[in-house]
């Protein structure tokens, strides 16, 4: 009986460990962005503790801008996509935009955070920033990773890959004041669908981008890791 109890406790520990595989962070792991382009004369090259790679125009003071408008990020990845990935190119832009808006509003870093819907002209004027960008990589990977108790993974599914580039624009002058690039990439653990893994990865990118914007709004300069 004692041996059976020990075996059951061991099985419970293994089950809990398997359940928690990959739960230490949200979505895929952050990676160095691949060949970020930037905008105009700004290219994201400086490592940031949250937003990946960034560049901030000299003299930019975000405290002078009480409002910010968030537009939808189109998917510009021209690679071959399967049916599920094609569906995500339609749903993820609005999902990501909403994640940014909700998280940024919760910080109270700006007195007004506008969500700009597709087909609506982005607001402009003094004291207003516009966050725009594009999703340059979107590959859902798959959820076919196989975990074998006591042995580890016998197979890892194709890697989920997502990369974004953003621009922070002064809407009065049209000048780009800051740019960022972030990338998430990792195989799916197999404990969630490919779609939910992609969504979690974009949640994480929204969270970390907002952390960067919050620091800018407080007048803090971009820091190196």
Where are these regions (language model features)?
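Envelope-exposed proteins and targeting segments
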Residues: 64-71, 100, 109, 127-131, ...
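C-terminal motif of bacterial Sec signal peptides marking the signal peptidase cleavage site
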Residues: 20-22
């Amino acid at each position: 009986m004692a041996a059976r109890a020990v075996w059951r406790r061991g099985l419970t520990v293994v089950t809990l460990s398997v359940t928690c595989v990959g739960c230490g962070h949200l979505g895929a792991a952050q990676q160095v962005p691949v060949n970020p382009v930037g905008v105009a004369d700004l290219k994201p090259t400086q490592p940031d503790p949250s937003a990946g790679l960034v560049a901030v125009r000299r003299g930019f003071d975000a405290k002078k801008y009480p409002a910010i408008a968030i537009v939808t990020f189109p998917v510009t990845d021209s690679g071959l996509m399967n049916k599920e990935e094609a569906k995500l190119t339609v749903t993820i832009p609005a999902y990501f935009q909403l994640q940014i808006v909700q998280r940024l509003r919760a910080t109270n870093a700006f007195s007004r955070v506008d969500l700009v819907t597709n087909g609506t002209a982005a607001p402009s004027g003094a004291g207003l920033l516009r966050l725009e960008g594009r999703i340059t990589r979107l590959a859902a990977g798959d959820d076919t990773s196989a975990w074998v108790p006591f042995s580890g993974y016998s197979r890892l599914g194709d890697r989920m890959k997502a990369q974004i580039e953003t621009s922070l624009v002064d809407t009065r002058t049209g000048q780009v004041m800051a740019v960022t690039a972030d990338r998430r990439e990792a195989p799916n653990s197999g404990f969630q669908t490919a779609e939910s893994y992609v969504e979690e990865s974009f949640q994480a990118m929204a969270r970390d981008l907002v952390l960067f914007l919050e620091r800018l709004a407080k007048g803090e300069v971009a820091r190196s890791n």
